[in-house]
């Protein structure tokens, strides 16, 4: 698999104790992937916006036969199409899975399907049972993320209905299902049941029974972090601010502020409740550097890469950067990955993390190398000459198994070698002139890094 390295630290002339992530190309040839999930087995299921669900095997091979094709039931284009997929917690026993799409009228549909009784890699296209049919006034702001929580309920996030500025004030209207987090019980003989602990459930309560939280603009993907008990919600801003919200899954009825506020900034507060009643984002970012639209991801809870543990991964669609939110709610960005507009993240059944690019049709696996402090103090290692042209020399390396890699300013690995001998030249004549970073790695965790100019 192809590896691409993105350094997420801000390099100065000497950096230690920094971190990097790798994107390994896992699968290619998909059409507009907008969701990645698993059915608690080794397969990945990828939702294509054109109405097709594909299966990817553990080696990255895409099954030739579609798992499901409902292209005739959807409208595909812009922000509309088949957008979400979730497998029932008892999928292995009942074969139920749920999809979120726009029908030809543009309405939001949440429907249940069943897997084939004879082939686990094919769904039964005739098994559709529609649970929700939500009209919406405009083409954009469709939301499109569904997940089961540990309570066994299906959680659904919707957009505010579209246009700009939420002209119908749907997100603040507790009797509209648009701009909301919904929560329903799908283990019902009818379409669904209302959980009795939903905040607006029951007669005489102002608000739709299905609503759990409100005040969302166009949340593009949410996920559950079961370690902390939060839903992580990435909400796309109006024109200036992108936001990340944490929603405790045991706290009902929260108002996330739109259209009254965009991020932490007042947007249109006419008729709004007091600011003190709003729940504001834990992190925001503006549109500097070509950023424009957040794509939500996951808190990493896998075991393979301990240095990523507890960090929330997301992306910006336009800047083609991956963002990482730490436990202090600080954001660090990778360098841009040009040509890949990241549209969704997903997990495998072992909590491995993946990201998809809607325009290139590629799925990448997120991996890492963690750079720590080398046993040799930085002052004992010398890299010379600098600038260099044909050769570079290194002195002071104590670990005979150390490896060297040269990373471009764009974060791409251009050279790697384990042939490091103190005082012996390393040929760099094939590397174009520019600014690079030379990393010495001792195993997986120990490293020295320095800026290198090649002329």
Write out the residue ranges for each language-model feature.
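Short, compositionally biased serine/threonine- and acidic-rich segments at solvent-exposed termini, linkers
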Residues: 365-371
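Acidic, Gly/Ser/Thr-rich repeat motifs that build Ca2+-stabilized beta-propeller blades
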Residues: 19-165, 221-224, 229-237, 241, ...
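Conserved blade-ending motifs and adjacent loop-strand segments that build the rim/top face
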Residues: 331-349
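Beta-propeller domain segments
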Residues: 80-82, 90, 160-332, 368, ...
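Residue-level signal for well-ordered, solvent-exposed loop/turn and beta-edge residues enriched
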Residues: 61, 153, 330, 372-374, ...
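Bacterial Sec-dependent N-terminal signal peptides
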Residues: 1-21, 373, 449
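C-terminal outer-membrane/trafficking sorting elements
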Residues: 376-384, 388-455
């Amino acid at each position: 698999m192809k590896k691409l390295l993105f350094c997420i630290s801000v390099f100065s002339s000497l950096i230690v104790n920094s971190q990097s992530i790798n994107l390994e190309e896992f699968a290619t040839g998909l059409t507009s992937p907008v969701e990645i999930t698993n059915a608690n087995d080794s397969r990945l299921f990828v939702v294509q916006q054109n109405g097709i669900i594909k299966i990817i095997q553990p080696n990255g091979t895409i099954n030739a036969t579609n798992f499901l094709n409902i292209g005739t039931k959807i409208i595909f284009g812009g922000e509309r199409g088949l957008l979400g997929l979730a497998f029932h917690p008892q999928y292995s026993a009942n074969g139920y899975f749920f999809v979120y799409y726009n029908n030809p009228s543009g309405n939001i549909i949440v429907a249940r399907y069943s897997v084939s009784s004879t082939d686990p890699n094919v769904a039964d296209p005739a098994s559709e049972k529609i649970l929700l049919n939500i009209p919406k006034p405009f083409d954009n702001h469709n939301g499109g993320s569904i997940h089961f929580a540990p309570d066994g309920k299906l959680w659904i996030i919707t957009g505010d209905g579209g246009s700009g500025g939420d002209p119908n004030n749907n997100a603040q209207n507790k009797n509209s299902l648009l701009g909301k987090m919904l929560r329903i019980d799908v283990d019902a003989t009818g379409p669904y049941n209302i959980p009795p602990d939903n905040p607006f459930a029951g007669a005489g309560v102002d608000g739709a029974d299905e609503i759990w939280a409100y005040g969302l603009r166009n949340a593009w993907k949410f996920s559950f972090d079961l370690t902390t008990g939060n839903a992580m919600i990435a909400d796309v801003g109006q024109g200036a601010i992108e936001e990340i919200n944490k929603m405790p899954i045991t706290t009902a009825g929260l108002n996330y502020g739109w259209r009254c506020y965009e991020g932490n900034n007042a947007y249109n507060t006419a008729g709004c409740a007091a600011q003190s009643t709003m729940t504001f984002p834990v992190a925001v970012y503006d549109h500097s550097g070509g950023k424009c639209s957040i794509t939500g991801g996951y808190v990493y809870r896998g075991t393979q890469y301990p240095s990523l543990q507890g960090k929330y991964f997301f992306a910006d669609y336009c800047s083609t950067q991956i963002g990482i939110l730490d436990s202090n709610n600080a954001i660090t960005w990778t360098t841009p990955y040009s040509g890949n507009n990241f549209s969704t993240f997903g997990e495998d059944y072992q909590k491995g993390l993946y990201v998809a690019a809607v325009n290139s049709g590629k799925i990448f696996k997120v991996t890492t190398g963690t750079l720590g402090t080398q046993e040799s103090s930085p002052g004992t290692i010398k890299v010379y000459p600098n600038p260099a042209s044909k050769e570079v020399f290194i002195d002071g390396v104590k670990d005979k198994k150390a490896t060297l890699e040269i990373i471009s300013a764009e974060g791409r690995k251009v050279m790697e070698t384990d042939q490091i001998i103190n005082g012996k030249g390393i040929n760099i004549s094939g590397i174009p002139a520019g600014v690079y970073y030379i990393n010495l790695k001792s195993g997986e965790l120990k490293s020295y890094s320095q800026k290198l100019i090649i002329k």
